[in-house]
Amino acid sequence: QAALDINTWVPPGGRGTREVVVLDPAVSGDTIDLIDDAFNANPTSMTASLEILAAAKPRDGVGRIVKGRRIAILGDMLELGPSEFEMHRAIAHDKHLQKLDIVHCVGPRMQHLHAALPEALRGIWAEDAAAMCVQIRKLVDAGDVVLVKGSKGSKVSTVVDAIRKLGHRRA
């Protein structure tokens, strides 16, 4: 029975949940694949989430930009202790970043990652989640796979909500 149940298991919201956000129901493929991992973050879980994003398949030929992208929107990892700035900077050396197209950063701690990212990957940095939400419409497009990851206290779950509000959600 346990083996059968695992096939229907879905992670709780904010813990790796995957969903499709339909931007325009009248246009085939006009969707964003959203990975909501906005409940918790530490260096190990950040690596695991980046690995999932790196393996994801964006779709080309749809949207304004035409080329589907792998986009990470990363919020602060909280309660890491005295070496927290170094831990944020160290994400810039994660091997999974090589497969991503752009990384946007949210929060004062993630400013350290933003500064350490290779220029080709460096998206925008926002002081807080509210500032990122204001810009979300121009940062994502149909065909993209978007990971939103951060500690609950970074409030990047509001970025997830802003992406959902771009269209009509389809589970």
Name what the model sees in each region.
Residues 1-171:
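ATP-dependent carboxylate-amine ligase
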